[in-house]
């Protein structure tokens, strides 16, 4: 009985190893979708303790990308929001990152219960080579 268990575990291990080796081959390469530049997206976030609205302001190109170049479609931390870059037309996720803004912290204050305010916020994403959708 011990041999059968060993063979079963050995087969499971071999299958797991083959799967792990195949995964990196399917991972997207930074260079396929992005230039070594940064796309800075500026927004205004406005509202009060209950309501919030986000208004796109402008976009800038910065000369280099200082963010991660691997595992681009995975989020590593939880935040109050998420910026996602999709390939236009296919909705394939090319890049994802989470964030928390100063506005979201302010929403928890007493002042936010009786006053509306707006805050500037910027999101940095790798500069796409082709048209993308950002949400």
Predicted regions and their residues:
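Bacterial N-terminal signal peptides
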Residues: 14-22
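Beta-strand-enriched, solvent-exposed domains that form extended recognition/catalytic surfaces
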Residues: 33-135
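Intrinsically disordered, low-complexity segments enriched in Ser/Pro/Gly/Ala and basic residues
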Residues: 12-15, 80
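Bacterial N-terminal signal peptides that target proteins for export
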Residues: 2-13
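Boundary at the C-terminal end of the N-terminal hydrophobic targeting segment
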Residues: 25-27
């Amino acid at each position: 009985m011990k041999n059968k268990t060993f063979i079963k575990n050995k087969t499971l291990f071999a299958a797991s190893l083959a799967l792990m080796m195949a995964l990196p081959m399917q991972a997207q390469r930074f260079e396929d979708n992005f230039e070594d530049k940064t796309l800075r997206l500026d927004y205004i976030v406005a509202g009060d303790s209950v309501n919030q609205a986000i208004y796109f302001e402008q976009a800038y190109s910065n000369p280099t990308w200082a963010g991660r170049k691997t595992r681009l479609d995975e989020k590593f931390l939880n935040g109050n929001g998420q910026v996602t870059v999709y390939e236009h037309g296919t909705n394939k996720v090319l890049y994802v990152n989470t964030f928390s803004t100063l506005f979201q912290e302010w929403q928890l204050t007493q002042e936010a219960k009786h006053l509306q305010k707006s805050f500037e916020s910027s999101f940095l994403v790798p500069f796409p080579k082709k048209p993308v959708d950002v949400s």
